[in-house]
């Protein structure tokens, strides 16, 4: 099974991917569940990730092509081999983030993004959880308190992009709304509980 987590920066998707991995590992064993992420997932990709995040003035198409090349490396070295071994793969970001950020956010043709993605991978996730959170809240969590209007507009476009992706892929995409209610009275993460319930029904 291939499970992905999506959402804008600061949505809490990384936390949820770790929590679900811990949950599944208790059921299926730690050796049968793989947690990975994009961009990254391999030693080479992690090094390139650091360079990309430090890069100044990289145009959006160049950035997209880097991400696509990194996805090929990640898919062939980590994701596909793990799935072939019948392991569960939990991935923090995948193709939907590319569509939302580079497509809806930066204005690159979404059809081009999908065509490039189809060149480098031959399968899509079985289940995708999109953690939805208010843009102002997400930027606050990301410590971007000094954000400008242009940045705010960008994240609204990205968030709307995720909505569109979910609408077009109801068979695999599930929106999990984060109403800023992190834990219940027993200290259990409420978003995690929502995710587990959806997973149990699939």
Curated annotation (Swiss-Prot):
UniProt keywords, alphabetically: ATP-binding, Kinase, Nucleotide biosynthesis, Nucleotide-binding, Transferase
Statement: the UniProt record of this protein carries the keyword Nuclease: no
GO molecular function, one term: ATP binding
Entry coiled-coil feature ranges: none
Gene3D superfamilies: P-loop containing nucleotide triphosphate hydrolases
UniProt signal peptide: none
Annotated catalysed reactions: dTMP + ATP = dTDP + ADP
Binding site for ATP: 7-14
Gene Ontology annotations of biological process type: dTDP biosynthetic process; dTTP biosynthetic process; dUDP biosynthetic process
Top EC group: transferase
GO CC annotations, alphabetized: cytosol
Record EC number: 2.7.4.9
Pfam families documented for this protein: Thymidylate_kin (PF02223)
Chain segments annotated as transmembrane: none
Role summary: Phosphorylation of dTMP to form dTDP in both de novo and salvage pathways of dTTP synthesis.
NCBIfam families (alphabetical): DTMP_kinase
Family from the record: Belongs to the thymidylate kinase family.
Name listed for the protein in its UniProt record: Thymidylate kinase
């Amino acid at each position: 099974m291939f499970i992905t987590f999506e959402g804008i920066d600061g949505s809490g998707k990384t936390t949820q991917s770790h929590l679900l991995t811990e949950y599944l590992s208790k059921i299926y064993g730690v050796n049968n569940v793989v947690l990975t992420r994009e961009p990254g997932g391999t030693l080479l990709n992690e090094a390139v990730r650091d360079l990309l995040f430090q890069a100044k003035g990289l145009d959006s198409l160049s950035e997209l092509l880097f991400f696509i090349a990194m996805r090929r490396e990640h898919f062939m070295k980590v994701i596909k081999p793990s799935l072939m071994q019948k392991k569960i793969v939990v991935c923090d970001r995948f193709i939907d983030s590319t569509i939302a950020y580079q497509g809806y956010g930066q204005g690159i043709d979404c059809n081009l993004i999908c065509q490039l993605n189809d060149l480098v991978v031959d399968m899509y996730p079985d289940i995708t959880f999109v953690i939805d959170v208010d843009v102002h809240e997400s930027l606050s969590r990301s410590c971007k308190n000094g954000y400008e209007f242009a940045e705010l507009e960008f994240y609204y476009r990205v968030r709307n992009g995720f909505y569109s992706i979910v609408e077009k892929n109801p068979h695999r995409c599930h929106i999990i709304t984060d109403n800023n209610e992190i834990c219940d009275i027993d200290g259990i993460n409420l978003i995690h509980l929502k995710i587990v319930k959806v997973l149990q029904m699939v």
